[in-house]
Amino acid sequence: RMRRLEAELGTALLVRNTRSVVLTTAGAALAESAPPALAALDRAWDTARSAAAGELGTLRIGYSLSVGAETAPALVDRLIRGNSGLEVGAVPMATPEISPAVADGRIDAGITRGEQPGRGVRRFLLRRARIGVQLAQHHPLAEHPEIEIADAAAYPLRLPDREANPVIHDQLSALFRDSRPHPRFHTPAVSFDMSQRDLRDGVTLAPAGEAAVMAQPAGLTWRPLRGAPSLTIHLVLPREQSPLHRRIRAVAKTLAHELHWLPD
């Protein structure tokens, strides 16, 4: 091997005789520079392996504002802590825009409330949550551990603007479709009021998933609706996935299992 290397370099690296082998000037230079070069090569291989495993790069996530209380922060935190080579950024987006943004590459992944339509993407169930209502602690129905849908329908019901999330709006309004008398729905003037001041009248109810408890202002509470179906949260990825996308999927799947987001 040494003679082949000398032939390729066109110079002797060793002086050989019957008693000893001594490095030439070229051989000494090679011996001095080889360890750093090999270490750099090892680092290059490690970097390539990390990239192939989806552990390097910039990750852009768009999420529905309503999953910003718990689900999106938990996934982003796990991605950051478990992958030091990833630069992760997450921003709220209008829910109907998330799947198209993933499909055309403006963002790498999305987290949506409800299974949103869209071409060129794959949707993975990330979380199931009970549907209930937010209400003032002094509301007459707050004394019940669970609320009947028919009982809730007797009060004014606040729903988000349908344009913000048609899938969820239609799912929530459908809960009360068969209620008599017909429920009184209204859309708030302020689309996202963190104080939830309209619920403090002790009359109005706001259908919401149980994750709403995580960002609930003082004076309000949440109660499940008996017999209501689950509200779902989905991870949205491109149909054609890179190692980075497969990494996101694996981390999300592990997190959902650990936090019991998907009951057996």
Where are these regions (language model features)?
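C-terminal effector-binding regulatory domain of bacterial HTH transcription factors
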Residues: 194-195, 209-221, 226-264
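A ligand-binding cleft/hinge motif common to bilobed small-molecule-binding domains
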Residues: 113-119, 170, 178, 191-221
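Central regulatory/effector-binding core of bacterial HTH transcription factors
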Residues: 56-118, 189
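A short LG(V/I)-centered, amphipathic sequence patch enriched
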Residues: 4-25
